[in-house]
Amino acid sequence: MCVKLWMLVGAALAASAPAAAVMGGAPADVPQSDAAVVFVQKHGRSARLEGLKDDRLGYYSFFGVRYAEPPVGPRRFQRPVRRYLSGELNATYYCQPCPQADPWNPQRIIGNEDCLCLNIYAPKMPGDEQGSPVVFFIHGGNYKSGSTSAYGGQHLTQKDTILVTAQYRLGSLGYFSTGEKDASGNAGLFDLRTAMTWVNDYISFFGGDPSRVVVMGQGSGGAAASLMALSTEGRSGEGRSGGVRGVAALSGTALSPGAVRAAGDPADYAKQLADRTGCPDKPPERLLICLRQLPFEKIVDSKMTTDMVDTKKFLQEISGRSGAGARVEGTYDERALPPLVAEQPSDSMKNQQQQEVPLLTGVTSAETSRAVFGKYSKFLTDKLASVKDFIKEDLMGGLQGVVSAVGGLVPARAGAALPLPDYYQALFDNSLNAVDGLSQIAEATGDALFNFPAYQTVKAWSAGGAASSYLYSFEYAGNLTKGAHFLPGVPLADNGNATEAAGSERAGRAGPSGPAHGDELAYLFEPLDARGQPLGGEVSAADARVRDNFVGLIAKFAHNLGAKDNTTKPNLFNLPFSKEGEQFIKINEDVTLDKNFRFCQMGLWGNIGERISGALCKDVIGSLLNLPKMTLPVTIPVTPKLPLLPNLLGDLRGSKTTPPRQVVQVTRATTKKPKNSALGLGGLFNGL
């Protein structure tokens, strides 16, 4: 059962803090060298922070460290005001989450506006050696829900990597915009920008290296992490936003359909908010004055859609496009504050705003399956039974409209569009029952909303040659805590009608397969309850191995950001994603390299005619479709068998793992002998 992380009560948590916490009085004695105490001298201020130490694993935790002033009163909707470390600080308990609807009782609002805090998990205290690389994590939740308290950082600390998790304003309080300079929107993103500045200033006091900071996020957090790296706002020194040296985007990028809202959405949402709160919608100044005088509970949208009445609303929910969210602010005209999102992300990538910042991004293999087989299964099975050609005519039309949000990166091809809707409809027509139809809906929505945006992102990110990009597919469905624990209330992670879906499986019908949205999180973070305690549960040998490999992948990415030679080109892989090979990392019980990520499906979504005309795609879909004649020749790259991969992080400080079992070799895509059977894997995890 998912623990309710959101029932945080500051007073109760403070009462439960260890007695050793220092709150004031006479200066304490100098602590022991391994005590969880940090002394700071910065910006003309002195501070002493006391945290917690885990004696078993040897890492240090500092919770609830405020990086900005509470955004209340006239500061509501405005950009954050920095808070500097000063005085005696108790860092032994979490802040409350930012205001949001309670996922278990949507009519109830939880949290507090004084929520702009971060947590730090450090493997060691500062010393003479080089500081540890830093992973700055942004939680998901479709820009309207989430908290840092669920994400324990102990696994990354065992790879000599610091984890920082930051809270930021959500929903209307974080992304409301009138289009005027006093409420231009994206306050939640600017919160994260301020938290990143805090990390640059202070992380060295916690044993971190500010020149090796990876911004990582999941879902909408992955989109936010990508937007941070594409931002021109606040660039200084080496010209990288907020010291961003690398981006790890999990199941969400700046090209995801829900990454930024459509042009008219913020204005429409502002009017809806005015109507709902009883405030005047015009002029904008009166609306702002009215909203700033209201309790935050009146502003947070507690209405959650429970009954799906049409396909459009279904797609809005699972694509993360409903409600308030990030927006394009427009270019800087020197009449207001500089924007963080100045243009469409696709334009930023074309203009190489990412500069030399490397990107690691990926997806789970069944992103939408839990939503399709759970919360929305009845709606979808009813549609499959009652609407002729539902997948082809209704669903696919809606998905193609959503994918247009990727914007300008779909290759333009002459001639008729490829038979994209026919492909998924043919899969359904060749199936036996409606549950198989759900499988095709899960495949189609997963391709459109996650796989294709990730694929387009890695292509565009590295197109200019300055930045490297890497793609992974997380395909292990283990027994660790599922995504609903980390993402309560998010439709993609919602267990929904799990009992009903399980009954369908018992009846001999197919069910969801593969990890769904958020299921990879327990393989990076220790799932924690509201008091910061591990949820526990059995961890199999395979679960432990996959967790070690996935944590190792992220840690190695951070460790190879090149602090000494001042470059951000990592030597993590000898084979980044490229136009020729399209290599990607496949994470299952073991880790392998593969080529041609969903090669034919990406060809259909990208309207790449010459790809579909090739022999490989004819083998994949030829039995389903009578493909039109295409005259463009194509050479299909061949996936050779790959050698075994060594342990991901065998020689990093603090690693306590054993080498993984032998890896099953990857099957060739064709029987044609490749020209070069060696893919140079010696450098893939060199020195790990």
Predicted regions located by residue number:
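Non-catalytic accessory segments of hydrolases
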Residues: 2, 14-189, 210, 368, ...
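Serine-hydrolase-like catalytic core of hydrolytic proteins
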Residues: 4-10, 22, 64, 105-293, ...
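Short Gly/aromatic-enriched secondary-structure transition segments
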Residues: 57, 61-67, 71-84, 373-395, ...
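A structural signal for well-ordered alpha-helical segments within the folded catalytic domains
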Residues: 60, 113-116, 190-197, 223-226, ...
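Bulky hydrophobic/aromatic "packing anchor" residues in well-ordered structure
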Residues: 67, 77, 291, 521-523
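Substrate-gating cap/lid region and adjacent catalytic-acid/histidine neighborhood
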Residues: 255, 297-542, 560
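Alpha/beta-hydrolase-fold serine-hydrolase catalytic core, especially in secreted/extracellular enzymes
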Residues: 355-357, 438, 460-467, 477-478, ...
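Extracellular mucin-like PTS segments
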Residues: 497-499, 506-509, 629-688
